[in-house]
Regions:
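N-terminal localization/anchoring segments of enzymes in phospholipid and broader phosphate metabolism
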Residues: 1-388, 397, 406-410, 420-446
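Cofactor-pocket helix-loop regions in the catalytic cores of large enzyme subunits
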Residues: 393
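Hydrophobic alpha/beta core scaffold segments
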Residues: 413-417
Length: 447
């Protein structure tokens, strides 16, 4: 009997069973597996013997303790939960793909059955059962993670959602309104009066949604161009873009189909936007479009004016309440020219000869950062004030790290906020003693 196909990231109970027999000789063991149903709640509340106490049991424990009822003619020798993760990378030859959307849809179907790269097993799992799983999944010992507790802790979000524990939760944070956009002033007038900087989630994301909504309805708006990487489930941004197209605006939307684990959602949004009349593009071959930018072209009494929103965070009204990000509204013509150049480039037109304000990757962002670090090093050598403060998701580029080491050795004071991987070592005498690295772990995700 072939080994069953185990779906990616599903929780399963593996068991060794043997035919019931009165004979004393060694029984032949067989492997059996039961998938824990995802349609049932994983946390099951059971009656408590003590007043004021609430007792819960995990669904997999119930199955594990009663698994013998599924194999009545067998003895259950052991039963333990396990979970696998498969390689989720999509293998796409964009040069050969006639339709990127269709090709990604094909690859997504294969994702559930990719190569196994990780096995999570209960720490006390029977070694015979673990050996069978290791052999069948063709993994090494280093790919096996023995967990001293429940597997797949995403279920803790369900615990957080249980009623009756409000006193243990952090008070819900309410973002502050943005002063410039209060009093129901026309959003374009506010931006004309001066650039507006936003810091989410401390400041409300509402002006960003209102910007697209007003652009969709404003009779003076000729065109809206926007990049979308991740959006919320019932996105007001998507609805506004669709409405803009239906109102006769020229709407161009870059939907990044390769946004990791959001591919299926983005395919749905791309089809919906196309159906509404938007021009949907997927970006440059071989590159992922990670920038967040909106360009609104508006006809005014003084002529055509371009309004731009740039941000570090996604156009996602849900995560904007949980992720720390920055954004800016401007109608500075230099930013308008650069934003137009970005969309022309993403649409397949040539790269502009010069950029006014935007630093664009992979064209020259790394080069520019190296220049700025070198500038501070020169300032330090000349006895001038020299300091670098930078915030990033990760730091693992060898050239950037080497440049920071050099700047530190020259006397530059360097403060880094690194959310994730950091390959730079601090405190090395003569090399990195002037570098301080912090990773903030708080109520919000440092995005």
């Amino acid at each position: 009997r072939p080994f069953p196909l185990i779906r990616n990231k599903t929780l399963n109970i593996g068991a060794l069973i043997a035919k019931k027999s009165n004979k004393k000789h060694a029984k032949e063991l067989e492997f059996a597996t039961v998938q824990v149903p995802s349609v049932l709640p994983r946390i099951v509340e059971i009656p408590s013997e003590k007043n004021g106490e609430r007792t819960v049991i995990l669904l997999e424990e119930i199955i594990e303790r009663n698994i013998g009822k599924l194999f009545l003619s067998n003895d259950v020798v052991c039963a333990h939960p396990y979970r696998i993760m498969r390689n989720a990378d999509l293998t796409i030859d964009e040069d050969e793909a006639e339709d990127l959307l269709v090709e990604i849809q094909k690859q997504l179907k294969k994702r559930q059955w990719g190569e196994v790269i990780r096995l999570e097993a209960e720490e006390k799992m029977d070694k015979r059962l673990l050996g069978i799983l290791k052999e069948e999944f063709e993994i090494k010992d280093t790919d096996i993670y023995n967990i001293p507790g429940p597997l797949d802790l995403t279920m803790l979000m369900k615990v957080y959602g249980m009623e009756g524990f409000d006193e243990y939760k952090s008070p819900k944070y309410t973002p502050a309104p943005v002063p410039e956009f209060q009093n129901d002033k026309d959003i374009f007038q506010v931006i004309r009066e001066g650039d507006v900087f936003l810091h989410h989630p401390y400041m409300s994301f509402d002006p960003v949604v209102d910007f697209v909504r007003q652009a969709a309805k404003d009779p003076g708006v000729l065109a809206i161009k926007q990049t979308l990487y991740r959006v919320s489930g019932h996105s007001p941004i998507i609805a506004a873009l669709a409405q803009a197209a239906e109102n006769g605006k020229q709407v161009s939307v870059l939907v990044e189909l390769k946004a990791r684990f959001d591919e299926e959602n983005n395919i749905v949004w791309a089809k919906m936007l196309e159906k509404a009349g938007c021009h949907v593009i997927y970006g440059l071959v071989g590159l992922k479009t990670h920038s967040k930018i909106t360009l609104v072209v508006r006809r005014e009494e003084t002529g055509i004016r371009r309004y731009v929103h740039l941000a570090t965070g996604n156009y996602n009204d849900s995560t904007a309440k949980l992720y720390t990000d920055c954004g800016i509204f401007t109608c500075d013509e230099r930013f308008g020219e650069d934003a137009t150049a970005v969309f022309n480039m993403l649409s397949g037109y040539s790269e502009p000869k010069k950029w006014n304000r935007l630093i664009v990757a992979p064209i020259w962002m790394k080069t520019r950062f190296l220049q700025l670090i070198e500038r501070e090093a020169e300032h330090a050598k000349q006895g001038k004030p020299a300091e670098i403060t930078a915030k990033m998701n990760s730091l693992c580029d060898p050239a950037i790290i080497a440049a920071l080491y050099y700047a530190s050795s020259c006397g530059v004071q360097i403060n880094l906020l690194v959310r994730g991987i950091c390959c730079l070592r601090t405190g090395i005498p003569g090399i990195s003693e002037n570098i301080h690295v912090r990773s903030i772990v708080g109520e919000f995700l440092e995005h």
